[in-house]
Every structure is written in structure tokens, then in C-alpha cells.
């Protein structure tokens, strides 16, 4: 499954969360109507990410955090072996960020899936990652968060002229 940094779409579109998700999960075109089984699949997916109350809301009316949780629900249907999160909380407020990562952490623990998180937020990485790959063009260092954060390579990447911190 894949959750992008952001989804580009016409925010004035009347497409609801149900329509959006059903378009990906339905065996028939959504314009023919959303079937009962598809609605059940959508509701179950939304429940996994604690956003079942959003199904009737227009996609463009969602906050950044709500939209990312809907995208997470879609990425989890069907359940993947690997979930890729590409800067998934870019532009999301602090409450949305915490809620998103708590949901991801819960899913990781209960479903035993591998999660690849691309992030520049070192606090999030330190808090939620089991393993870290530090890159600057190529792999510079890898290991558990503390080992990587305490390394000379980390200091060189983030605290020297070539780094961005």
C-alpha cells in the first residue's frame, strides 16, 4: 500500500469519501451505484483508521489529517505486506500528525506489517521507527534509531555544511 505526501485533486468536487474509496474498491463503475458489499468494505477500511464518520463528507472538505487517514485506509485495502508512507503528514497540524502516527503504530502492532516511512521529522522517526536508514544521495548509515542518531555520520549529514538541519 502507498500513502503519498499529498493528493492533487479538485477540492471543489462533490466527490464524497465513500465515492472516492468505492471507485478503487468496486468491481463495477461507481457511476452505476455503490453496491452493499463495496460500502461494507469502505466502512471497514475507514474504521481501521478511525475515520468512519467521514464517509459522507466531500473529499475537498476534509482537513489535511483527515484526508491522510482516508488515504491510509485506502492503502490498507486489501491489507498489504508493505505499507509505504511518503512524508504522509506534510502540511498536517500537530493534532492530525499525532493521530495519524498513533493509528499507524497501532496498525503495525496488530497487523505485523512492514512499514517504510520517508520522513525528515527526526522526532517522529526517533519515536516510531524500529530501524533507520540515513541517506544523503546514498545510504550513509543504518540501524536502530539511537545508533544512527548518535553516529558521526548523522552529525556530518545534519550539522555540517552539506547537511540540512
Task: Report residues per predicted region.
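Conserved beta-strand-loop-alpha-helix hinge in the C-terminal portion
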Residues: 138-161
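H-loop/switch region of ABC-family ATPase nucleotide-binding domains
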Residues: 119-120
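Conserved ABC ATPase "signature" region
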Residues: 36-54
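A short, surface-exposed alpha-helical micro-motif characterized by mixed small hydrophobic
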Residues: 125-127
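Conserved catalytic motifs of ABC-family nucleotide-binding domains
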Residues: 79
